[in-house]
Amino acid sequence: MVPKEAARTLDALSDESAAAIGRVLPRLCRAVIEATGVEEYNVLENNGGGAHQAVAHVHFHIIPKPNRSEGLGIGWPMHPLDPANAASVAERIQAALK
């Protein structure tokens, strides 16, 4: 799915375009399920080259996951979350939203 508004990353989209994505993406996911018969899927959206964005505009991939070996595979190492650091980051995010 590609939004009508041209933007390189998700954070650069207007609130209106983001709201439109929120309305359309679930409908598109339902269509993918119906078309493929696969009920499990990943929605992927990358922002920036370091995050594996290969095309320089916001777009979403809906990737059916028919079984453990097909579809998107995610293999990043899990690390315990430091509660103090998490609280600090949450506070900074909350402040940035104001």
Label the predicted regions.
Residues M1-K98:
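HIT superfamily nucleotide-processing domains
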